[in-house]
Swiss-Prot record:
Subcellular location: Cell outer membrane; Cell surface
Main location: membrane
Induction: By iron starvation.
Gene that encodes the chain: tbpB
Protein name: Transferrin-binding protein B
Comment field (misc): N.meningitidis cells will only bind to human TF, not bovine or porcine TF, explaining at least in part the bacteria's inability to cause infection in non-human hosts.
Lipid-conjugated positions (N-palmitoyl cysteine): 21
Domain of life per record: Bacteria
Comp. bias regions, Polar residues: 52-61
Length: 599
């Protein structure tokens, strides 16, 4: 990375140049041009090396989403072999992403509503439905299960003969979690499944009504399942198809089980088990998402009594609700025979019980500062800082092929323009957004675990970075992020032993800080005060005769991001409190990386 001012100065005095850019995209290790004598007295810093988290899976259909739906298979059972389908398979590409909205609202369900006519729309319910766990039914953020019409489609003119449920298997959540518990928590709920449809396929253990031939066998139609309280023994709490998960948030693991609850009557001497385990779950947490395996519990059932004989390596899901109150996910068995969805929650709160729930820690930051109101608004995130969710629409923040070496870059997708910083940051991203003539700023990052921040004890950790700012008072000033000498600079000294942070934000081509920042560390974040100097900030410094000055004092907040608190960032906004026409306003986002001494 070459600075022309530095190059010119090199012609007249000895200097050292800016350090090499990390990854070809720039770094924050900016030092003023110095003489040889200064080099011996002033230390020089460079970005600490870091590695981005590996992408678990970049395939479109296994990427994070609000939810997924799969069409219930129905094969064309036409009497003419020319049109008859012998097999309607399931495949990984059959899962369709669901968009943001209420959990029980999505386009596939709307499609069924439009064509239902006088038919009943049948869908899974937890409160009094076919599957439920008593004490774990008050779901707010998640829905999972099925929605379908009992409506055959016999259209001889178009050579279509379809029998069985017409609908979808799905899960959907809202408000992806930004905080998660920090201890072991039990979640309970339900699960549902559908199989492929294959000519002459029957599963004796599911009953004749479940399907499998002309249509996929569906959990809602499985026979011999305990669904009614009247048929249960005293104190029984689990009905239908139930799920149970133990999530250890400290070591980021999930263990779970998917059950069938058996209907046992006096005349039923064949099945005396209260529960039958169908799958056990093993998964690992990644931010507010998880990925793992579903292990079939009865692989030896090769006689066709049931379809649950193959493991799945494609299990995925996430936590929903502000503090990880609920979870949901899906998988497809490796033999493509079974598609399954599940949803579960923490135990329902009783009246008068502590509503706060278990202790949590922040795992993700994602927000924007609106350009009109100068207010912080939370936005959704699935924990991938290379993607941004704007009003539920996913934007890739990756640079184009021609911009991969750029320190910051611009993108334009789905009517949104974004300027994204910075190429040397692996665990956070921040920048500017423009949509429908509205200009906002944004920041998102994957927080450092609280335990990692607590383990740091150094008294003088240095972080360097840059910032975007907009400041107004009669006239306005705006500043762009930069890694050039003389550009917008952010510098912080962090004392992890006393939990104190002091820093400055300096504007382009200026020597005095635009803002000084003092803050205190709490857990894996910080909060404090950002304020202009005693004389204020000159919005138009070239106008020496009648320059506009603004005085700002605002609450600043932010967090540490990545492994071992390698990065930090934050923001503040000031919506103004002066009479109309003289309002002082500001919005700022900043990011920085920890520095190391150049050896």
């Amino acid at each position: 990375m070459n600075n022309p001012l530095v190059n010119q100065a090199a012609m007249v005095l000895p200097v050292f140049l800016l350090s090499a850019c990390l990854g070809g995209g720039g770094s924050f290790d900016l030092d003023s041009v110095e003489t040889v004598q200064d080099m011996h007295s002033k230390p020089k810093y460079e970005d600490e090396k870091s590695q981005p988290e590996s992408q678990q899976d970049v395939s479109e259909n296994s990427g994070a989403a609000y939810g997924f739906a799969v069409k219930l298979p129905r094969r064309n059972a036409h009497f003419n072999p020319k049109y008859k389908e012998k097999h309607k398979p399931l495949g990984s590409m059959d899962w369709k992403k669901l968009q943001r909205g209420e959990p029980n609202s999505f386009s596939e369900r709307d499609e069924l509503e439009k064509k239902r006519g006088s038919s009943e729309l049948i869908e899974s319910k937890w409160e009094d439905g076919q599957s439920r766990v008593v004490g774990y039914t008050n779901f707010t953020y998640v829905r999972s299960g099925y929605v379908y019409l009992n409506k055959n489609n016999i259209d001889i003119k178009n050579n279509i003969v379809l029998f069985g449920p017409d609908g979808y298997l799905y899960y959907k959540g809202k408000e992806p979690s930004k905080e998660l518990p920090s201890e072991k928590i039990t979640y309970k709920g339900t699960w549902d499944y559908v199989t492929d449809a294959m000519e002459k396929q029957r599963f004796e253990g599911l009953g004749s009504a479940a399907g499998g031939d002309k249509s996929g066998a569906l959990s809602a139609l499985e026979e011999g399942v305990l669904r009614n309280q009247a048929e249960a023994s005293s104190g029984h709490t689990d009905f239908g198809m139930t799920s149970e998960f133990e999530v250890d948030f400290s070591d980021k693991t999930i263990k779970g089980t998917l059950y069938r609850n058996n209907r046992i009557t006096q005349n039923n001497s064949e099945n005396k088990q209260i529960k039958t385990t169908r799958y056990t779950i093993q998964a690992t947490l990644h931010g507010n998402r998880f990925k793992g395996k579903a292990l079939a519990a009865d692989k030896g059932a090769t006689n066709g009594s049931h379809p649950f004989i193959s493991d799945s390596d494609s299990l995925e899901g996430g936590f929903y609700g502000p503090k990880g109150e609920e979870l949901a996910g899906k998988f497809l068995s490796n033999d493509n025979k079974v598609a399954a969805v599940f949803g579960a929650k923490q135990k329902d709160k009783k009246d008068g019980e502590n509503a706060a729930g278990p202790a949590t820690e922040t795992v993700i930051d994602a927000y924007r500062i609106t350009g009109e109101e100068f207010k912080k608004e939370q936005i959704d995130s699935f924990g991938d800082v290379k993607k941004l969710l704007v009003d539920g629409v996913e934007l890739s923040l990756l640079p184009s092929e021609g911009n991969k070496a750029a320190f910051q870059h611009e993108i334009e997708q789905n009517g949104v323009k974004a300027t994204v910083c910075c190429s040397n940051l692996d665990y956070m991203s921040f920048g500017k957004l423009s949509k429908e003539n509205k200009d906002d700023m944004f920041l998102q990052g994957v927080r450092t675990p609280v335990s990692d921040v607590a383990a740091r004890t150094e008294a003088n950790a240095k972080y360097r970075g840059t910032w975007y700012g907009y400041i107004a008072n009669g006239t306005s000033w705006s500043g762009e992020a930069s890694n050039q000498e003389g550009g917008n600079r952010a510098e912080f000294d962090v004392d992890f032993s006393t939990k104190k942070i002091s820093g400055t934000l300096t504007a382009k081509d200026r020597t005095s800080p635009a803002f000084t920042i003092t803050a205190m560390i709490k857990d894996n974040g910080f909060s404090g005060v950002a304020k202009t100097g005693e004389n204020g900030f000159a919005l138009d410094p070239q106008n020496t005769g009648n320059s506009h000055y603004t005085h700002i004092e605002a609450t600043v907040s932010g967090g540490f991001y990545g492994k071992n608190a390698i990065e930090m960032g934050g923001s503040f906004s000031f919506p103004g409190n002066a009479p109309e026409g003289k309002q002082e306003k500001a919005s700022v986002v900043f990011g920085a990386k920890r520095q190391q001494l150049v050896q």
